[in-house]
Every structure is written in C-alpha cells, then in structure tokens.
C-alpha cells in the first residue's frame, strides 16, 4: 500500500517524523529506546490491511529531533496527543515495544479518553522490573556517554535516551488499576523484563490479557514476526478492533 511520510511540528518547535499507510481505524506503533519506527518493518505490511498505521519516530529518535534539554515520557506523550489532534483523530489503538510500551502506558494514564486498546510488548513501569544485568549494561552506557559528551556533543542526546531506561516511568500501581481499555501484555520467554513484573502489569490492568511466548526473547516482534503479528491481530480481533 501507499506510504506517506510527514513531519509534525510540536508547540516547542520539535519535529516528529511519522509514516502513514493502510485503511481502517488508527493504529500507532511506538518503538523502543534508541531505535526508530523501522523496528516495525515486518509488522506494517500486515497491519496496514486492517488499520491506518502510524509508525512514529519518538522525540529525539530516528528522524525526529528534540528542542528541549531533557527527555521524559510525559513530554513524549504530549507529542502523541498533538499528532492525534493534527490528524483529526478521536482515539487510537497503540502497540508499543519496550520503552514504546512504557510511553503507551504513560499516555494512557494522561489521556485515557484517547486510547481504544493497548498492546504492550515487553514494557515496565519500574526500573526494578528489568533484569539486573540489563540495568547494569544501561548504567555502564550512561557512564560511557557521559564521559564522551564532553568531547562529542551529540552524545548528549544519547544520554537523555539512556536516562529513560534508568528511571521509573512515573506510572503507579493505582494508575494501572484505572486503565479501562482492553490491553494485551505480550513478552518473550527469555525477556529482559522479569516475568514477575509482566504478570504484575497484567494483574493490575483490569482488562489485560497475558501472553508469554516460548523460545522468544525481548525482540520477539523482530525475530518471529509471523507469530507475533498473529498474536496481536487475534487479540485486536477479539476486542473488536479489526475491521472485517
């Protein structure tokens, strides 16, 4: 299908890049930390048959810039609500991976009326929800890029991304209880997010379903897209989000 590319200007002058294709109700795809919308290259060809798919480069990622000296999830959530307004949408379904899932959760708490359904692939609201070695690696990267940014200015942007992984999202357990839309928590058997935390999310969100795929890791959608895509479509079909 025909794909269109756009830049959406935010009130602070930041330009958010996104690609749009397909027909049907809107589906936002939100990538993980340090990545871009290209992560979903194996999802778009199928999903665009059922949805108008918006593949978004989050602020400071991919082709999107950031005019602010900081980066956090509420700021990124505000970008999404601006994009929704500019596209004249009322509400959207969101599929988020890793930090994209965290962003989807923050967005759902801040703008609950804008969310039809959620697919949360390997998200975590607390840093403690990620396995120790992954947090250790993020901390090591933080030190490396902090030292490097004195000599290479562009490392400052990388620092802001890494800090996202080393701070809690700001979503509380009580706020999870208030998420009213149908939600799928989907993770790999060998995920970076602990099983305990993923089950906690599924238990805390009233209309949540939980899928844990054997043989898969944090990058399930990229490693085994056919399986991942069918799980997502089956869920969205079950809650009435897939157009016949």
Predicted regions: what is each one?
Residues 14-63:
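Conserved HGGG/HGGXW glycine-rich cap/lid loop of the alpha/beta-hydrolase fold
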Residues 54-95:
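Active-site loop/oxyanion-hole signature of alpha/beta-hydrolase fold enzymes
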Residues 159-175, 190:
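Active-site nucleophile elbow and catalytic-triad environment of alpha/beta-hydrolase enzymes
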Residues 179, 185-187:
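Short beta-strand/loop motif that positions the catalytic acidic residue
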Residues 205-219:
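Catalytic histidine neighborhood in serine/cysteine hydrolases
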